[in-house]
Amino acid sequence: MGQDAFMELLRSMVGLSLCKIHLLLIAGSCLGLKVTVPSYTVHGIRGQALYLPVHYGFHTPASDIQIIWLFERSHTMPKYLLGSVNKSVVPDLEYQHKFTMMPPNASLLINPLQFTDEGNYIVKVNIQGNGTLSASQKIQVTVDDPVMKPMVQFHPASGAVEYVGNITLTCQVEGGTRLVYQWRKSGKPISINSSHSFSPQNNTLWIVPVTKEDIGNYTCLVSNPVSEMESDIIMPTIYYGPYGLQVNSDKGLKVGEVFTVDLGEAVLFDCSADSYPPNTYSWIQRSDNTTHVIKHGPHLEVASEKVAQKTADYVCCAYNNITGRRDETRFTVIITSVGLEKLAQRGKSLSPLASITGISLFLIISMCLLFLWKKYQPYKAIRQKLEGRPESEYRKAQTFSGHEDALSDFGIYEFVTFPDASGVSRMSSRSSPASDGVTGQDIHGTIYEVIQHIPEQQQENTE
């Protein structure tokens, strides 16, 4: 009985001490001692070790340093885990293999971490010196399992028709806690709108009804405080179309819905439209208020020389056998001889570069011809100089240019003829005593020809 009473007294004293410590924690840290932690919330993975770093500092002399760790859950009293005075550690025997501390470092190591270890961890530091200083901090610890890779399934698996069917996408995860789901399309988050809605946990996406704009790559991103994983890309099957039906050709000129084709050309027409699955195409020719199908498939070849009329009307029809929708476009083919006209237009339409090149060549050739003309016809300059002389100077020049001594007249001369009357009279007066064999035609020749005859005349006179 006495032993039971002693144990009861010991329990009451320990409980009283824990209550006092808890009250001190609520009061906060004391002046001169500061305890800090990097984060007030730490997320841990079940089965792995978790380290709770703690730092403290003080500016007064200390004889003893005491560190105490407590653990509490919601609506429960704090539980003693371990403590130390200086470098001596006193653990709770129940947790001596789970919690580790190496004083004077106040950090705590939890290994291994279990779901039962989730809660608040309180660290209290006491400094004994001239007085006692105390400070504490609280750290919240959460424990989770990592997320496993999710898988996405969609229904119906065969696909849905645009504006008619609906699609449901479901994200499934086999492992993980506190899961958060997010749906993405082509890498961007999907938000709620008139056709998109989610389940309460966001693990299901409904698209009602589906449209062509809903085509894309869908993924499910699942995360929790310790990890995140994204599913493989899935692309639901959506049937739509046809949209944007149009006809093009490899030759000819297209203006609106009219194709102009040169006579003798074989033109290949192509009919295309956006749809899934691909459309089936048919070509219809209209003539004399009647229509008849001439070909099936996306291509139609028209030989212009085989067309009886110069104008022909055609229709291209596109049909989607899944959506049940169809579309058609009409066009006209005009056959004309435009080959010569094209050549004439090409000849008339010179490019600016060709025009500049032609003008440049013309200027260069003109400058070269002008240079040659000035270089090899200098008589004009001499003529202008002689015509500007007075008559007396000219006669004086004639007087002293006789042939008294023909041998001294040999040399290199440059003469100019004068076709006017004054020039003829001057030349005739100068050349008359030369020789009887010189005719009137020689008088109108150059002075170089007269000089050529003078030596022969003088030689005859000497004989």
From Swiss-Prot:
One Pfam family matching this protein:
Ig_3
Q: Which cysteines are joined by disulfide bonds?
A: 171-220, 271-316
> Transferase as a keyword?
no
Q: Which GO terms describe its biological process?
A: cell division; centrosome cycle
Per the UniProt record, which residue ranges are transmembrane? 353-373
InterPro entries in the record: HEPACAM_domain (IPR052280), Ig-like_dom (IPR007110), Ig-like_dom_sf (IPR036179), Ig-like_fold (IPR013783), Ig_sub (IPR003599), Ig_sub2 (IPR003598)
The membrane topology term of the UniProt record is:
Single-pass type I membrane protein
List, alphabetically, the SUPFAM superfamilies matched.
Immunoglobulin
Q: Which Gene Ontology cellular-component terms appear in the entry?
A: centrosome; Golgi apparatus; Golgi membrane; midbody; mitotic spindle; nucleoplasm; spindle
Q: Which residues form the signal peptide?
A: 1-32
Residues assigned to the Cytoplasmic compartment are: 374-463
According to the entry, every stretch annotated as the Ig-like C2-type domain falls at: 150-234, 236-332
Q: Does the keyword Transferase apply?
A: no
Q: Which residues are glycosylated?
A: 86, 130, 166, 321
Which keywords does UniProt give here? ADP-ribosylation, Cell cycle, Cell division, Cytoplasm, Cytoskeleton, Disulfide bond, Glycoprotein, Golgi apparatus, Immunoglobulin domain, Membrane, Mitosis, Repeat, Signal, Transmembrane, Transmembrane helix
Q: How is the protein altered post-translationally, as described in the entry? A: Poly-ADP-ribosylated (PARsylated) by tankyrase TNKS during late G2 and prophase, leading to translocation to mitotic centrosomes. N-glycosylated.
The record ties this protein, via Gene3D superfamilies, to: Immunoglobulins
Name its cellular compartments.
Golgi apparatus membrane; Cytoplasm, Cytoskeleton, Spindle; Cytoplasm, Cytoskeleton, Microtubule organizing center, Centrosome; Midbody
Explain the purpose of this protein: Required during prometaphase for centrosome maturation. Following poly-ADP-ribosylation (PARsylation) by TNKS, translocates from the Golgi apparatus to mitotic centrosomes and plays a key role in the formation of robust microtubules for prompt movement of chromosomes: anchors AKAP9/CG-NAP, a scaffold protein of the gamma-tubulin ring complex and promotes centrosome maturation.
* Protein name according to UniProt: HEPACAM family member 2
Gene that this polypeptide is encoded by: Hepacam2
